[in-house]
Amino acid sequence: YPCGSSSGSGAGAASSMAAGAVGTETNGSVICPSNANGVVGFKPTVGLVSQQYIVPISSTQDTAGPMTKSVMGAAMMMNAMATGSAKTNYVAALDQDMLRGKRVGVLRYSTGSNKDINALFEESLNVLIQAGAELVEITENPIQLSEFGQYSFDVLLYEFKATLNAYQAATPDTVKTRSLAEVIAFNIENAGIELALFDQSIFDAAEITSNLDDPRYIAARDAVLKATREEGIDKLLAEHNVDVLVAPSGPTVPRVDPINGDVWPPFPGSGSMAAIAGYPHITVPMGTIHSLSVGFSFMGAKDDDAKVLSYGYAFEQLTNERAEPQYYTNAEDLPDIAAAMRGQKRN
């Protein structure tokens, strides 16, 4: 199922076309397609995995991450993908008893209004209790900055132009578009193909920004990083004295509508905070709703990647909710959806 720029990786891992796949995330593109396709998705701390040869969007948020059928598979991929001189053995760090004695912060403000997702989430929380964890209720969203949405978007516009220009300039001479401006011009020249379904208004907005020395960019970047780090995840972990944060990973995936646009349901989850902070986040399948998968998220502090993987592993060993793939020609062939379209209720 599509959800974000790594949808192909999610579908490939879910359908067993590969034991694992690499996704790339700026804000949700590892977690969202993993949630939608019923696989494990791990978004590492930004900087832990090399971004070389990956088309960039944001220097503060971009990261590659594994999308696999199990947490063990994600840990194995991280052993190969992680960089740095003091490399961690992520497989050896997995502990199926990781939840015992831990204080877990439950992000109640991010649960959304879908009763089926919330029911699965409550069942998953009971699993944590049975595993020996203590739950701590967190009801207030720590991000209170009124300009947060605009600031975070501005940061992406500035960083997209700067990072893409550098990336395009370093490509082989056979690549004819050497900058964002030239990409925009190419799309206009080939509008019948490149702009048949979508415009490039975001490209245009990025192109008119200045450089990363602009005080407007610096102020916006510092504000959103502070809101998601010191006043966000770091504050929640410290003030509530918890080891890790949990939430539903996201909604069930909507149908794709290239004409009118996809219609997303009320969006549970808190992945944007971890994405913008650049902190680790894992989603593990917690069940299905009308044949559609949904995941359970663990989020931690900067560089707590091994711990976050291990929390996910402990949860997975107790639940094993990943659904084996079934193959249909289109979504309307799914039993629940087919019955609904016929006006019938499936037994």
Place the predicted regions along the sequence by residue.
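Glycine-rich, small-residue loops and helix-cap segments
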Residues: 1, 201-347
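Short glycine/serine-rich loop segments
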Residues: 1-78, 276-288, 292-297
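Sec-exported extracytoplasmic/periplasmic mature domains
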Residues: 14, 79-83, 126-133, 157, ...
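Loop/turn elements at helix/coil->beta-strand transitions in domains of secreted/extracellular proteins
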Residues: 16-20, 70, 101-102, 131-134, ...
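Active-site-proximal beta-strand/loop segments in catalytic clefts of secreted hydrolases
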Residues: 22-26, 45, 81, 107-110, ...
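A short helix-breaking turn/cap at a secondary-structure junction
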Residues: 40-124, 131, 142-145, 189, ...
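Short helix-loop capping/hinge segments that flank enzyme active sites or metal/cofactor-binding pockets
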Residues: 98-105, 157-228, 283-293, 342-344
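Short connector loops at secondary-structure junctions
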Residues: 133-151
